[in-house]
């Protein structure tokens, strides 16, 4: 499906459908008023019949409007003009797709006027991403081929010609971010018998072929891990026939404007049974999503390469599988991490932090200025923040504020939680430097405290996305979060100007 930006006369557009906004009390937007005048009041006469009130959720399809070349006009209710926010705007756009996608409509022109969502850049970007999200189809592994929509192209009409340049920039960014989000979702939604640690490494290597001028990939296999002393990482994968692979993706942009080295680490547990501390059977199938952190890092690197960001970015996909087997690590084991610190294992289902701790230590060789790890780490974070908000932890206030700012810009909500010294005491061990799990309280915080012990040499942030990375139930599947947030963080580091 293609997107286009242009400034046009709506009555002259030969298209299948023009979408315009109507507000409460049947107040027409400027675009709707223009079409109404061109049709000699035809739209007003139909609205007077009372079939649309302008409330959010209202839609009315008009056919063969006089003196209008478009085959249809879709009036979309937007509620009260001064109460439209990002959430309502997304709902409005979703309603338009619901009204259109089952019809034989291939080409659409959107002309949304009198809607104030920040500036034209954010208006266009949010439109494109919301429309793409509404049209996303989860990959199904079956022999049924169902076409979800006939839509081939969407044109966004820009009212003011002076806004065309920034609108085209917004479209470029939105399409790159959507590519990142869609790639993340598609990878996350794969079944674990297909997407295993080796498969993750193949996906990483594909990037070095597609973006050969900017991306280099190194794969760390179990032999190399042993040489490096990554014993915690290795231990997690010992129970599985699918051996661990760590993919190191190095992106180098052209004409670099920011000399900082930015690194992302993604937890890539392609399946997590819990190991010997086995999980309950109910919902265990969803543990294929325990690699959503790695998928998010993978997607974010795609965006950087698509937009040729003038940055140096490293992404690590920490691929592993936690299974029950005769070689599985056990509660009571003591592991020596790559950093030399020792960990007493009290629960084998607290495995993500063991994979991440060695990955975080490995990153030291690149002397990164910023490291952000992304992980479906703890159920405790879901208990604390629910399924709408990700947890944020950091050892650096400036980095934390930058992520919070990107969160506000993208409406991908995160919330900062503490790393006070009192929480570190929960990890005390009698026989090792510390244990891999606390005593049952503040689990998301103690998990972050564990990771913080391996991040002393750089500015670090941890995003716990256990509650936000996927949805359960009838419309289950990966959400693609927090990819847009991470992409926005990189755009901000790139000094892009939006207006």
From Swiss-Prot:
It catalyses: Release of an N-terminal amino acid, Xaa-|-Yaa-, in which Xaa is preferably Leu, but may be other amino acids including Pro although not Arg or Lys, and Yaa may be Pro. Amino acid amides and methyl esters are also readily hydrolyzed, but rates on arylamides are exceedingly low; Release of an N-terminal amino acid, preferentially leucine, but not glutamic or aspartic acids. It is found in: Cytoplasm. Mn(2+) 1 binds at residues 272, 349, 351. Keywords: Aminopeptidase, Cytoplasm, Hydrolase, Manganese, Metal-binding, Protease. One of its GO terms (molecular function) is manganese ion binding. It is an enzyme of class 3 (hydrolase). GO terms for biological process: proteolysis. GO terms for cellular component: cytoplasm. Gene3D superfamilies: Leucine Aminopeptidase, subunit E, domain 1, Zn peptidases. CDD domains: Peptidase_M17 (cd00433). SUPFAM superfamilies: Macro domain-like (SSF52949), Zn-dependent exopeptidases (SSF53187). Its cofactor is Mn(2+). PROSITE patterns: CYTOSOL_AP. Binds 2 manganese ions per subunit. Transmembrane segments: none annotated. Presumably involved in the processing and regular turnover of intracellular proteins. Catalyzes the removal of unsubstituted N-terminal amino acids from various peptides. This is Cytosol aminopeptidase. It comes from Buchnera aphidicola subsp. Acyrthosiphon pisum (strain APS) (Acyrthosiphon pisum symbiotic bacterium). The gene is pepA.
